[in-house]
Amino acid sequence: MLLLPSAADGQGTAITHALTSASTLCQVEPVGRWFEAFVKRRNRNASASFQELEDKKELSEESEDEELQLEEFPMLKTLDPKDWKNQDHYAVLGLGHVRYKATQRQIKAAHKAMVLKHHPDKRKAAGEPIKEGDNDYFTCITKAYEMLSDPVKRRAFNSVDPTFDNSVPSKSEAKDNFFEVFSPVFERNSRWSNKKNVPKLGDMNSSFEDVDAFYSFWYNFDSWREFSYLDEEEKEKAECRDERRWIEKQNRATRAQRKKEEMNRIRTLVDNAYSCDPRIKKFKEEEKAKKEAEKKAKADAKRKEQEAKEKQRQAELEAARLAKEKEEEEVRQQALLAKKEKDIQKKAIKKERQKLRNLCKTWNHFSDSEAERVKMMEEVEKLCDRLELSSLQCLNETLTSSTKEVGKAALEKQIEEINEQIRKEKEEAEARMRQASKNAEKSAGGGGNGSKHWSEDDLQLLIKAVNLFPAGTNSRWEVIANYMNIHSSSGVKRTAKDVIGKAKSLQKLDPHQKDDINKKAFDKFKKEHGVVPQADNATPSERFEGPCTDFTPWTTEEQKLLEQALKTYPVNTPERWEKIAEAVPGRTKKDCMKRYKELVEMVKAKKAAQEQVLNASRGKK
């Protein structure tokens, strides 16, 4: 709506009425090309610029149609209208050089041109002979236009285009010129793809992603090509519904078979290209080199890790070795310190013992007669063996600082305490031995050995034989029984059954009872090998300090040290036994020699017992 401008300042607006005739209402109809363009845009809901582009496109297509040159088909007039299905429809319309690329406008224009040229009326007017009805070749032009103007029928004909090359290059053909051979093949087969933007084959410079995308596309190729045009039977010609269904079934089966053959052809094409593609070989070599590099890097990393672990292990071993050496050094120092303390203790005890003997000798052993003196000397030796260092020091201090009567009283008191202690120990040992014997007899009841008495000597001999013939000895218990029968002083003959029963009863004893048995055996040994007192009329000899024979039983550790020393110092070694005694702490040369003789006797007895059992078994056989 148009409005007049307002009046200027200081001026007014005047309204005038023109003296004209009355208005009349008339109808106006819009016409012209601009109105036509407006209506098209309104109907298509498009802008003016979009419509302008459409117009340009139509103009370009019209210009192409005007520039299109139709090819003359020389065999057109010789075509049989009844065999129209086997004709080349594009060639009939003069589009043989354009074929599937021809647009609908071009097909329409070509048909129009062919009609103007070959219509029967026009040819008849020109004096040419005309066949009646559908027998004229013009029918072929009509059929060609019917097939190509219908998109469905045209697609069916394009699928079986007689000019299309369905051949697949072999591997030998593309060995040297792969891209020149396969590029046009993939290019012409790309027309069957349902998907647009079909990837190109590329060249040697194509990336792995492009090549992979290309082969992925063709291995999953989606083709629209179908073969309904080659149906042998037309369902429209069927006389009934059943016949039509049968025809459709036959046509579907034939189409499926041809579709399968087509997909096999495409797959063969892709397989041949893939096997001949030099880029695939290059990518495989690169992948192989990459994997080898990764494998080498992994191996290097593993080797470095192993080297680090080995280095750490060696460091740990070195640290453990140093710690062990340090610990061994500490143990050795402690052992040396303990040995020094023990030596100091021994020297102190030895000194106190000698002091006690000298003090008693000074007081003439507090006796007036020789018999009392000898007895007192034995008691003093007993004190020296039984008393500890502190008791010896206290007794020596008392004897040094007191008179003869006080010293004698102190000495006699100490002797009385020691004798009382020995008596109690002896009674306890005898009681334990009696109890052990009773327990052994009870546990061995029914074992065949209850009626045979086992003396202390036989028990010690049994223990010795069990240690002498360890487990694993052939006919062990027979050998032990034979050994006891040979060396026993009781005269009682033992069988293997008796020995087994007694050995089991001894194993059931508590540790205190075993200690009592061993101690009693040691006391007996000491008694048998002890010093015999001289006669009363004999002159007492002067006592000299020297190494005395140690009657303490040999421990397992001392036995190992002795065996090692015997191996270390052979028979031809000078001062052999002195060196062996030095290698066994706490043992003298005499102790080592005596122990060696005992071992030799034990080995001989063991061999003799084994030989006797062996001879007895041979005699039975």
UniProtKB/Swiss-Prot annotation:
Main localization (coarse): nucleus
Q: Which GO terms describe its cellular component?
A: cytosol; nucleus
**InterPro entries the record matches:** DnaJ_domain (IPR001623), DnaJ_domain_CS (IPR018253), Homeodomain-like_sf (IPR009057), J_dom_sf (IPR036869), Myb_dom (IPR017930), RAC_head (IPR032003), RAC_head_sf (IPR042569), SANT/Myb (IPR001005)
In the record, what terms sit under GO molecular function? chromatin binding; histone binding; Hsp70 protein binding; ribosome binding; ubiquitin-modified histone reader activity
Q: Which terms under GO biological process does the entry name?
A: 'de novo' cotranslational protein folding; positive regulation of DNA-templated transcription; regulation of translational fidelity
State the residue spans of region: Disordered: 294-315, 426-453
Q: Which SMART domains match?
A: DnaJ, SANT
Task: Give residues where Phosphoserine occurs.
Answer: 47, 49, 60, 63, 183
Put simply, this protein is called: DnaJ homolog subfamily C member 2
Organism annotation: Bos taurus
| Underlying gene | DNAJC2
